[in-house]
Amino acid sequence: MEQSLDGKTALVTGGSKGIGKAIAKGFTDAGAKVMITSRKAEVCESAADEIGGGCEWEAGNVGNPEHMEQAIDRTIEVFGGIDILVNNAATNPYAGPMIDADLPRWKKTIDVNMTAPFLWTQMVWQKYQKHNGGVILNIASVGGLETNPMLGVYDVTKAGLIHMTKQLAAELAPQVRVNAICPGLIKTDFARMLWEGDGGDMVAQQYPLKRLGEVEDIAAAALYLAADSGSWITGQAIVLDGGGQIKF
């Protein structure tokens, strides 16, 4: 089945490192023109150079509607459209029991992990995909499908993102396919506190496949869903966790 993205254009939020950068690299390798966006200009520029393939960048606060509109407009201006939107940017400023969370960090987590993906999707739909079709990919988490004593606030936002995926898939069909990817523990800087040292080995041993995920694992799934290979998939939350959901 075809997994080429020749002639396609993509916008990846949080695309300067980790999962977002790997997805952007996978898309450019498959022939797409990609715009990445993240907060720091120097990090975006360096990432775009490493990604190659004519990757462009637009720095700014991914939760700021003004930046969203600027990045979307520039992507359409430079590439002619946005066939694929990847809502990857996320934050996790609080770890601990959800009942003890303070309001500022609660609101920040919701703003970045739920409100921002909705606004990015809404703007891309209104400015391009409503009339041209496309694909939306939301990077959620297995945390959105289960409970965790220390990550409740983060997990609630990812559960919301998963349901948002299903709702928007129903609303935007047949023009746009909307799917979520739910990674388990991936070896990124974002999740370093969970996998560095003995903790990562302990988690890996709980997975039937006995290893932690790599960013390339997520990029491969994103490519499958974005390309024609995923043309009959929408409204799904695809779990990539080394079998963690089925462990004994």
Task: Place the predicted regions along the sequence by residue.
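Conserved glycine-rich cofactor-binding loop
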Residues: 16-17
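Short C-terminal tail/terminal secondary-structure segment
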Residues: 92-95, 146, 223, 234-248
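Substrate-binding pocket helix/loop in short-chain dehydrogenase/reductase
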Residues: 96-98, 102-110, 191, 203
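Active-site helix of classical SDR
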Residues: 121, 157, 165
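Alpha-helical segment proximal to the catalytic Tyr-Lys
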Residues: 126, 169-174, 231
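Residue(s) in the substrate-gating loop at a strand-loop-helix junction
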Residues: 141
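C-terminal helical subdomain
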Residues: 180-183, 201-229, 233, 240-242
